[in-house]
Amino acid sequence: MSPMMRALQHANYTFAKKISHTADSQDQRHRMIPGSRPLLTLADTREPDYITPALLQENPRGKEVYERAMQDAWYAKNQLLARGVPQEIALYLLPNAKSIRLVESGSLLHLLHKWTMRTCFNAQEEIYQSSLDEIAQLREVHPQLTKHIGPPCHLRAGVTTPICTEGSHFCGVKVWLDFPNVQRRI
């Protein structure tokens, strides 16, 4: 690591997040950005507490089916608890859409790597949006840094080719022309 890059280890940021269990599991791939996650047994709710994917938000029939499935999952879990099944067993019924609230902290060096990977249009939608939210919070305290943050194509444009590092998985959108103001369509 170059001496200039080492300085990025000294700037640290902390974010409070609410994401689905699925997104949290994927987000944990960035091991250098640790998070404090609650035990599911301590964060259990009687009422459904889940994340709805953007794709379903835009589809009334799909959203209706999805919400019914969430209601059914929590109802079944609550029925098991009422019948004396241990909580750690009953929680197996909860879907991966269950909301997880956590606090995550990391150095600017490691967050830059995460944001580069997770602001690409090929990133999972929920993690993409979470990364944009984190960058927006960073912009409030250190606006001068955010021009150096974005997907690989944003960082490589005008510097090297190919601009997109995804090869045959190129999303087809020239994100680098107007990041972060570009619209992501699902």
List each model region and its residues.
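A conserved ligand/cofactor-binding region detector
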Residues: 1-186
